[in-house]
Amino acid sequence: MKKITVLFSVICSFFVVLTFLKDGFAGQKENIKDDKEIKAVYISYIELNSYVSGKDEETSKKNITKMLDDIKEFGFNTVIVHVRAFSDSMYKSDYYPVSNTVLNNKNTYPNYDVLEFFIKEAHEKSLKFEAWINPFRISNQTSLDNVSIDSPYYKFIKNKDAAVIEGKGVYLNPASYEVRELIVKGIEEIVKNYDVDGIHFDDYFYPDKKIDLHSYEKYKKDGGILSLEEYRLENITTLIRNVYEMIKVTKENVKFGIAPEGNIQNDYENSYLDVKKILASKGYVDYIMPQIYFGFENQTRPFKETLDEWNNMIKDESIKIIPALAFYKIGTTDKYALSGKNEWIENSDIIKRQILYSKSVSNYNGFSLFRYDYIFNENKYNENTKKEIKSLKEIINND
């Protein structure tokens, strides 16, 4: 009887240990899920032009590694890298020409896959990597001199689905089904072939109010009933829904998010992004990263009220808000802030306070800073920058 009692105790202990281990490992998995607070930095085509373009292989790799080391050592955990800034590609694509931002000192693509190297280095440093896409922009100049002969511009100009827009550059037509199909295929290529953690759009959607007039005229002739404004909003919503669906079918764990302009009225009236619709239900984005590049004292768009407005538009709890913050404004006059124009000069802890306030909103999941050079390139520092960096490090590393 004593032996049976001992055996029973051993068996019970075994199951207790198993239960503990199971719960323990489940807890570990939970801790590394996607709910982790995002602390992101943008690496734009401007940084790529400075540190990768025109460099030999050794130097470009060294510079990429340094950027990622800087970001990791500061305390960030995510990089948002310009993989397709001008309807081009950081890698060898079947749909887009190679980007000038990654051509080497011989003006050719280097002997390594730049995107693959970027991702591998980021992941080795425990950094998430999001591929940043500008879907419709081909150039920010009106001259075609720097537009590759392999650019989609030359395919779509035949049907007026590409245009040179005075004062803005060269763009594709958001109303074109074929243009949207190209964009989705180009992103699918990235998601299938590279271990990205996310796909990221910013605020470049409709470039002007003329590019799609011929498309709308045909739409009306074919029996379309939407107003011009509704038509444009639906074109962008359709693209976003198609990108989201493709990503979830291809690799469900890859996130999709958008960084629209912080001014919601401009999103509707200029970019034709229906932010209320895409934040109302699942199926469009995993996160929204509004560019709230405003100080607390901004006369027309004060930071707190603007962030609250964005947060309150989210109606599905699976969608998170990750405000993008204007590190580049530190120590400068913000003339558009009107009565609050000197706020960034008179204060040196604005970013810190913005992050702390952001943490209080219900759908908060992190923040991002625009952009790498303003944080790490001392040539861009001013009197306030180092003070802001010091206060920022205090909260990033104490979380």
What are these regions (language model features)?
Residues 89-103, 137-166, 203-224, 339-343:
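Aromatic- and acidic-residue-enriched segments that line the glycan-binding/catalytic groove
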Residues 53-72, 179-190, 266-283, 303, ...:
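Short, acidic/polar
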Residues 55-74, 101-125, 182, 234-239:
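Aromatic- and glycine-enriched glycan-recognition loops and surfaces
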Residues 74-110:
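Aromatic-lined carbohydrate-binding/catalytic grooves of carbohydrate-active enzymes
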Residues 62-89, 193-198, 283-287, 358-366:
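Catalytic domains of carbohydrate-active enzymes, especially glycoside hydrolases
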Residues 32-60, 130-131, 136-193, 340-345:
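Active-site-adjacent "subsite" loops/lids of carbohydrate-active enzymes
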Residues 280, 284-302, 309-399:
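Substrate-binding cleft of secreted/luminal carbohydrate-active enzymes
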Residues 156-281, 293-294:
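Polysaccharide-binding and catalytic clefts of secreted carbohydrate-active enzymes
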